[in-house]
Amino acid sequence: MLVNDHKGRCVFVYNRTQETFVATEARVADGYFSRLIGLLGKRRQWARPGQGLWIVPSHGVHTIGMLFPLDLVFLDSKKRVVHVEEHVRPFRISAVSLKAYSVLELPPHTIFRTGTQEGDQLEIGPMAGQGEGPPAPDGRADVLKSGVPK
């Protein structure tokens, strides 16, 4: 299964196509309650660049009860981007993508900043200290000199 390796953890999200990090610290929501609650009631401080929530499985989300807008990236089971929605305001319902297996909820402007678009291939992996290898000094995933995650 796609998320068993990341259960109850934070992950990094790297866009291999655009060669940029989409999120350096995305929480995994793969249980009933974690998917149900998601980011409801979270304050705007959550929406800093690099933050995120990876909802697995999911074909769509809503922002009812949200306090700030979100960018949404819909991924298939191979972590390829199948749909994006920018700046989804609170109290809205996103599109439903039957091609999607999971959804990334990201701070506003992340899609624009990273150039993420349909067809991009993402890599999602454990943050340093939660998987193999030594943690990086800043607590983020180790990165090769080329900028590609290990």
Residue ranges and their predicted role:
Residues M1-K150:
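Compact, glycine-rich, soluble single-domain proteins
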